[in-house]
Each structure stands twice: as C-alpha cells, then as structure tokens.
C-alpha cells in the first residue's frame, strides 16, 4: 500500500518563533511512518518547512518539506497553511491508496479531503475548541466549515474525548480510537527501577513544574530523603525552577538535565519509579505513552486525555490533584503498576497503530464492494 502522511507541525512550539530541532527522528510521526515502512508499505511524510531539521538527515522513506504561507495570520506553530497540499494531492491522488492528515481544524486537512475525499482519513486529537482568539476561529471552523465541507470526511480520533467532540461536526467519525504510538524496538522496557522519579517536559508555565517540586520536597521530608528527581527538558522557567529547588532545600536531589535525545533520556525514563505530570492544559501527551512503553508508571493530573486509560488499566495514578502520598503509593505498589505497564505497552506499538489504520481502510473497501 502507498501512503501519504501530511503532518505540518512535527513537534510542539509554544511560540511563533519555532526553534528548529537537529533531527525529526525522535518525533512521534516519524516513528509512525517508520512503522509503515518496516511493515512493507511505501510511505511519504510531509512536514512544514519551518520544522525542517537543522542537520542533513537520511531517511528510509520519502520526506517532503512544504512552505507555509501567510505566516502572519496562519502561524506555522498553530495553524500552518501549505498551499502545496491541494495541488500535490490532486495531482498524485491516483498514486496513493491512503492519505492521513492531522486535525479537523486544519486548512491542510480540508485541502487534502477536498482533493481526495475517498482516500483521506483525518487523525484528530483536539477534544475541545482551540483557544486562539477566544475560540472564535475554532467555533466558526467546526460550526461552519467542517459541517459544510468536511461533514462526510472520515475522521479517526486519538481519544474517546476527542471522538465525542468531533463527531458533533463530522458525521463520519469512526467509533474506533487510535492513540499515539511508540516504536517498541527503540523503547525497551525495564522492570528494575532506581530510587528516582522523572519529569519529561518543557519548562513552561502550563506544565506547573513548580508544583512538582513542592510535592517532591514533601515526599523527601515524609517518606524517602534519598530519592532523586530528574527534570528533562528546557524552557523559559528553568532558572526560576532551579532557584526554587535551592529555596526548598532539595537542590541536591533534583537534577536538571536539559533537553535530551531519546537515546539519552531512555535509560533515565526506563529506570525511574514514575513519570510525574502536573499539567493544567494538554491533550494526549506523548511522554506518557513513552513512559508506559518502557514500563514506568505515571503520576498525573486528570488533564491529559491519556489519563482515561491510566485509570482504566491501573498504569499509575491520575487524579485532579495528586500529592506526596500518591508518590508513596506508586512506589509502595510499584510491582503492580509496573506489571500493568508491561502488559499494556504492546497496545502502544506504532505497528499496532498502522494495523488499526489499515483495518479501517479495509473496512471501507469491503463496504464499497457491497
């Protein structure tokens, strides 16, 4: 099967000033396309040119970088506009068996669907209206554009919450949910854990890392004074958080590693007793998926959409407000949580995700023969 994957935003940028990464090989969408390739399919990945890596890379499949236009209005980090989408899909639609785009609220998804309606699947993540400009553009898009011009588009949501939201506007939303996947050949699991927790996050306001430091300080005081906390990531609040660790008297126990590649962070992530998340605004978090894939339980707020299956399968603790007692709980019951993660990790495989998409496409073809 020949597959086209259109994903302009290759990684998250909190501001319009996109900091180009050295490589895209640590991104979720790269691993997704790699799974197609390894399963014997021909795949082409399209990204927005502002996300093109700084160093030259060789890929086992075709990767195209398309220019983003009208950047003052259609900012590439949140609403990229690639005019090449419509021209390319219209011209090459006969060559592809399946076209996968990201998000219903997307000019590129609209163009791909209008150019090849029978071959396009929109992989949708948002479970509520986009907050840009007080939600007005989002409400107009879903209420008018999606209902009029994407009403019959095939949509596959990445969570139950996203499915329940988008099906109000796109009637052909699939009942099946396909979450982010992980390359299990890269993410090796470990049941052996060190005396440490880990945070994998941008160091920005909405991630509320300061709250994690406060809870960790109480955990050290009440339960385990020798435990360590690895904070992996960069961001505007790094120096403030380092000063806070000093003020709380926990600086010797907190290690700020900076941003790390997958190869660098995996030994830490796989050996930690839990991944800690304190976000107040997120959708599906790929760091949660990656932690479960290496057998590391989660302690998180109930904000990430992943929290639903964390609760359902007891992959850790997900609640509105967690505290130091929950850290003690995940450590005291680590054997159970780790075992559950070990069982669940196979559901997260990128190859499993590919098979789910192929099954949806097979069902469409079978329905067409009836």
Predicted regions: what they are:
Residues 1-51:
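N-terminal subdomain of nucleotide-sugar transferases
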Residues 4, 191-218, 230:
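Conserved donor-binding/catalytic core segment of Leloir-type glycosyltransferases
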Residues 30-32, 138-156, 169:
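Membrane-proximal helix-turn-helix segments that form the acceptor-binding/catalytic region
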Residues 161, 181:
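Carbohydrate-associated surface elements
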Residues 240-260:
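Nucleotide-activated donor-binding/catalytic signature segment of Leloir-type glycosyltransferases, i.e.
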Residues 280-281:
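Aromatic "clamp/platform" in nucleotide-sugar-dependent glycosyltransferases that forms part
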Residues 297-300:
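Short hydrophobic beta-strand element within catalytic cores of glycosyltransferases
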